[in-house]
Amino acid sequence: MKRKNIALIPAAGIGVRFGADKPKQYVEIGSKTVLEHVLGIFERHEAVDLTVVVVSPEDTFADKVQTAFPQVRVWKNGGQTRAETVRNGVAKLLETGLAAETDNILVHDAARCCLPSEALARLIEQAGNAAEGGILAVPVADTLKRAESGQISATVDRSGLWQAQTPQLFQAGLLHRALAAENLGGITDEASAVEKLGVRPLLIQGDARNLKLTQPQDAYIVRLLLNAV
């Protein structure tokens, strides 16, 4: 039986570093919010069967998203951290029968709204049938420095280093087990949780355009990228 590909967007964060008067996923770039741009990517992709957004129980912006994308599931069961939000989303997918344990969950940052469709297709094609799952990533290009008290303490060898992106694709059952720990401290992405089980996910070539909206100046670059699409 064909595995379903389910996009899961954790959107319960408040984006403190971005400095806006609302969570950054609800900041407007052009005529749409960042989150609406993200949802459009997955809704347009023929290989994605379902898209789910998990927001905070206190979210007051999600109704607009639901109106714009009535076919998207918007769940207000987000947690205090990204890992908790993803865990809650995966658990509900399994509990409701919307996902089987072998279905693929593609977890994607709500602030990465420039994901090229070809990068998404590449991830699904190369990792969609892999038991260990896989993530989009790009080789580290810049020279890395280790700091101590505001000074360089060492230059880090960047050979073999990759910068993780999203989506990160894993079977629902594996992801559920990986996030089942009571203490999720130190889990910064889904791959790091899966790695703790001894699993080594695949690295799939990502795309430099798939940047994450983090600082206010990132909005300028994102706007240019979206206009170029």
UniProtKB/Swiss-Prot annotation:
What family does the database annotate? Answer: Belongs to the IspD/TarI cytidylyltransferase family. IspD subfamily.
EC number assigned by the record: 2.7.7.60
Q: Which organism is it from?
A: Neisseria gonorrhoeae (strain ATCC 700825 / FA 1090)
Sorted UniProt keywords: Isoprene biosynthesis, Nucleotidyltransferase, Transferase
In Pfam terms, one family for this protein is IspD
Q: Where is this site: Positions MEP for the nucleophilic attack?
A: R158, K212
Q: Which NCBIfam families match?
A: ispD
Q: What is this protein called?
A: 2-C-methyl-D-erythritol 4-phosphate cytidylyltransferase
Q: Can the keyword Transferase be found in this entry's annotation?
A: yes
